[in-house]
């Protein structure tokens, strides 16, 4: 058998304890200067590279590290600058402004990266002049060489980059052709600098419509081959299966395939002879998206199968390790569960164990991981019985009747205003929560602090003039982690952070066992907030689909079963809130769209299961109780009918960064439930103008019945500063008041 090699597609940027996030946010807050930021990030990049080197990888990725987002990096590399930001020097401050917006200009759109919880900044092609502006990829490659790291450069490929872009008058094919000479310039510079191969990521080739652009894909890679670059290129794909016969026909040196999330299709195509054995096979055999340890015996058998179909086998994670935490080393977890976990460094060590086994006949690491896996699997985490059939999955009455009863009960004005749920998580709030968790303050002291914050923000909302209030979620570190801490069957780590967008990090809980509600989760804070005001206060919950999608899910039972277990737990909390007198309850599902499978053949079942779980969680209440939900970051065209099927009394949707595109989705459906299309972007510190809010409202009312329309920001306000929140919400309420006055004068 031939020697196998090991490689990696990408590594977490955050650092073990979020050093990356803290440095960038300190720079934004003017607490450090650019020189200190650069030094901190250089040190972290070096640490990441050397850490990977410790696991004896034959090649280590460079170009995956970024100050914000690798797609935005590619935009700046090729001078694809949004028109409103043009005319400035291409540097890191420009990058941050495109991503976050500034006082003069809105940020670029923020979209989910395929079906993950990572987000990328959408490239904009309007009136651009593509050119290689600053070859930062070459700089990073040379840096890796300077510290004696055997690295391979990583760049997103032209097909994926253009497909994820928007704007411009050129066709898709014309944009690709425009970029090819620029890609050639960058790729040639890397080869000239000594790159043995270049990882060119084309995950778009796993999607449904990839066959419709096979011609331009072939044209692109034929071009690179004719320029003498083909043999240096390894096309990496991940998250799903590919059309392997086509991909193998491209004139490149190697192909990377996901052999974890492909539902077995990629392996079958290999076994059917569709892989060109003259190429290197980069086999994604270790799960890059979940945190469970590999069944190393099964991986050994898979490698033995793959060796029959290629002379050049490289084993790697199934995708970039961007989607998992850095290391288990700093965790203090129950060993019985920890033995079943594997973060980024552990996944690299699993690869090293397999490399040693096959190349050196060294069984030590292999036997270690095999024993750990067998001990973990010997435990039983399936020990609860569920009565799914006894819980209703439909509201008692149709929406029209519910709306009438809710209008009488709530007595809200025309164009009611609200927020999505969270208010700023200040340093003081985080400190109090940390002090409480570490027993540095008493329960009573912590509760007093929370009540003071809730009372302060109830008054702020009343003073601004909002119609439906929220308690602010000051007791919550994260909208999923909070529930993971309180529901049976979840494990919450201490340092299990992953990047969501920009400097935003989340700490997904790990679902290891059966899920159960054991006590009220949110009732105390919500009831206290309601006691302070005559206006309705929303109960704020996270929905079952989002909790599952934003957790590391267990793999020993079907996904639908876990999702419905969570739904029953949320149903218990919904009923507890209703019984406590809460009239409006929001069950957020921001991640419903992101979990949609990349292949359409799986869409119907996914959406059917998602709708069922949401209704399982929300249908037990009385007609008078108003159920809200919220979604964000998404392209909704594919799921608009499923959104309607949720039968939520009101849905709020992020739309501001789509620059109005989302409203087009409502032209094909007569949406007859309550809806709020977010009227300003909370991801940017920029304060909207009344004119912008009014324009957003007017545009929405062209498609949405006024009696159904709500006005709200597009997401929670957790990451904003207090003055930004107050100023923006004041603008929003003033704009709505003027719209109401216009209506009154028209009907007078």
Curated annotation (Swiss-Prot):
Zn(2+) binds at residues 630, 632, 654, 715. Catalyzes the transfer of a methyl group from 5-methyltetrahydrofolate to homocysteine resulting in methionine formation. Its EC number is 2.1.1.14. NCBIfam families: met_syn_B12ind, PRK05222.1. This is 5-methyltetrahydropteroyltriglutamate--homocysteine methyltransferase. It catalyses: 5-methyltetrahydropteroyltri-L-glutamate + L-homocysteine = tetrahydropteroyltri-L-glutamate + L-methionine. The gene is metE. The lineage of its organism: Bacteria, Bacillati, Bacillota, Bacilli, Bacillales. GO terms for biological process: methionine biosynthetic process; methylation. Coiled coil: none annotated. Binds 1 zinc ion per subunit. One of its GO terms (molecular function) is 5-methyltetrahydropteroyltriglutamate-homocysteine S-methyltransferase activity. Its cofactor is Zn(2+). Pfam families: Meth_synt_1, Meth_synt_2. The active site is at 683 (proton donor). It comes from Staphylococcus epidermidis (strain ATCC 35984 / DSM 28319 / BCRC 17069 / CCUG 31568 / BM 3577 / RP62A). 5-methyltetrahydropteroyltri-L-glutamate binds at residues 18-21, 112, 550, 594. InterPro entries: Cbl-indep_Met_Synth_N, Cobalamin-indep_Met_synthase, Met_Synth_C/arc, UROD/MetE-like_sf.
